[in-house]
C-alpha cells in the first residue's frame, strides 16, 4: 500500500523494492510448508504452481481494470488490503492449529514424517548440480517465453493491446494446468524419464515455432508453454526428496535465487536477440537451451533410486 502513496519514480522504486523484499519469503518458506510431512509432493506443488501462474496470467488484466476504473494507485491499494487480510487470517489459522495440536509447533508435530532417506554425498552433489543447472536454464526459458510471447502475438496478429493480452492470458491459463499432469506423473513414476520428455518436447516445439506463422503460432505457443509450465514442479519435487525439512527452506531459497537472477538477465538478452535477428533466432536459442536440460536429466540415472520414496 505504500506504493500507492508515491509521488515520483524514486518513491515508486523504493516501494517496489520493499514489496520484493517482503514477497521474497514466499518461495523458501511457502514451498517448504507445502511439502512438509508429505510423501507425495508432486500434486501439492503443482496446485500451488497453478495458483501462482494463474495469478501471473490475471495480473495484467486485473491491473488494467483497476487502473481504468479507479486509477493507478488502486492497483497497489487493492492487493495491499488483500495481503493484509490474508496475513491476519493466516495468523488466526496458526493459532487454531497450535491449539488443536496441544500447543506444539507444526514443525514438532510433523517431525520425522516423510523425511528423505540418507543420500550419499556424491549422489547429492550430482542431483543438486542437475537441479541448479536446469533451474538456471529453465528460468531463462520461462522468462524468455512469458516475456516475449505478447510481442510475438502482436507481430503475428492484428488487434488492440487488449486482444493481444487476451491471447496471452489464454495461453498462460491453459498451460498452467500442465503442472497438475506432471505433478501426478512425478508422484507415481520415475522422475528422470518425465523430466527428459518434458525437456525434449520443449526443444522440438521451440524449433517448430521458428517455422510457423498466423493462427498456427497460437496453437504451437500453447503446446510449448504446456511443456514450459510442466517443468516447474519437477525441480521443487527433487529438492523436497533429497533435502531434510530443517534445510529445505534454504535449498528452495538458493534455487529461486538462481532462477530470479537468470530471469533478470533474460530481459536484455531477449531485447538484443530480437533487435538483431528477430524471434526466430530467439526460439532457436531456446531449443538449444531445452536440449541442454535434456542432457542434464540423463545424469539423474544413477541417483534416482535413492531420491525416490
Regions found by a protein language model. Name each.
Residues 51-98:
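Helix-loop-helix hairpin linking two adjacent transmembrane segments in secondary transporters
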Residues 126-178:
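Extracytoplasmic gate region of multi-pass secondary transporters
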Residues 65-70, 153-154, 185-186, 270-277:
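Interfacial helix-cap and linker-helix signal at transmembrane-aqueous boundaries
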Residues 92-117, 306-309:
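Flexible cytoplasmic inter-helical loops of multi-pass small-molecule transporters
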Residues 11-25, 136, 216-230:
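Hydrophobic core of transmembrane alpha-helices in multi-pass small-molecule transporters
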Residues 1-7, 201-213:
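C-terminal ends and interior cores of transmembrane alpha-helices
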Residues 15-52:
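Cytoplasmic helix-loop-helix junction between adjacent transmembrane helices
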Residues 242-277:
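A late C-terminal transmembrane helix in Major Facilitator Superfamily
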Amino acid at each position: 500500500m505504500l506504493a500507492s502513496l508515491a509521488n515520483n519514480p524514486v518513491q515508486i522504486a523504493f516501494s517496489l523494492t520493499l514489496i520484493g523484499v517482503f514477497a521474497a519469503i514466499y518461495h523458501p518458506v511457502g514451498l517448504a510448508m507445502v511439502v512438509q510431512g508429505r510423501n507425495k509432493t508432486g500434486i501439492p506443488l503443482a496446485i500451488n504452481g497453478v495458483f501462482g501462474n494463474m495469478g501471473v496470467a490475471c495480473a495484467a488484466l486485473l491491473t488494467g481494470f483497476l487502473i481504468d476504473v479507479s486509477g493507478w494507485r488502486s492497483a497497489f491499494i487493492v492487493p495491499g488490503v488483500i495481503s493484509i487480510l490474508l496475513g491476519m487470517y493466516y495468523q488466526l489459522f496458526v493459532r487454531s492449529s497450535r491449539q488443536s495440536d496441544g500447543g506444539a509447533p507444526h514443525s514438532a508435530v510433523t517431525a520425522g514424517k516423510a523425511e528423505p532417506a540418507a543420500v550419499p554425498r556424491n549422489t547429492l552433489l550430482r542431483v543438486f548440480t542437475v537441479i541448479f543447472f536446469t533451474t538456471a536454464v529453465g528460468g531463462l526459458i520461462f522468462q524468455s517465453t512469458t516475456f516475449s510471447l505478447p510481442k510475438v502475438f502482436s507481430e503475428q496478429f492484428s488487434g488492440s493491446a487488449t486482444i493481444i493480452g487476451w491471447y496471452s492470458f489464454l495461453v498462460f491459463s491453459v498451460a498452467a494446468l500442465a503442472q497438475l499432469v506432471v505433478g501426478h506423473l512425478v508422484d507415481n513414476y520415475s522422475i528422470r524419464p518425465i523430466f527428459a520428455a518434458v525437456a525434449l518436447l520443449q526443444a522440438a516445439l521451440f524449433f517448430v515455432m521458428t517455422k510457423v506463422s498466423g493462427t498456427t503460432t497460437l496453437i504451437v505457443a500453447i503446446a510449448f508453454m504446456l511443456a514450459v509450465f510442466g517443468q516447474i514442479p519437477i525441480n521443487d519435487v527433487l529438492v523436497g526428496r533429497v533435502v531434510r525439512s530443517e534445510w529445505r527452506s534454504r535449498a528452495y531459497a538458493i534455487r529461486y535465487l538462481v532462477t530470479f537472477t537468470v530471469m533478470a538477465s533474460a530481459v536484455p538478452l531477449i531485447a538484443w536477440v530480437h533487435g538483431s535477428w528477430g524471434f526466430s533466432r530467439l526460439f532457436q536459442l531456446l531449443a538449444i537451451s531445452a536440449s541442454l536440460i535434456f542432457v542434464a536429466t540423463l545424469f539423474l540415472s544413477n541417483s534416482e533410486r535413492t531420491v525416490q520414496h
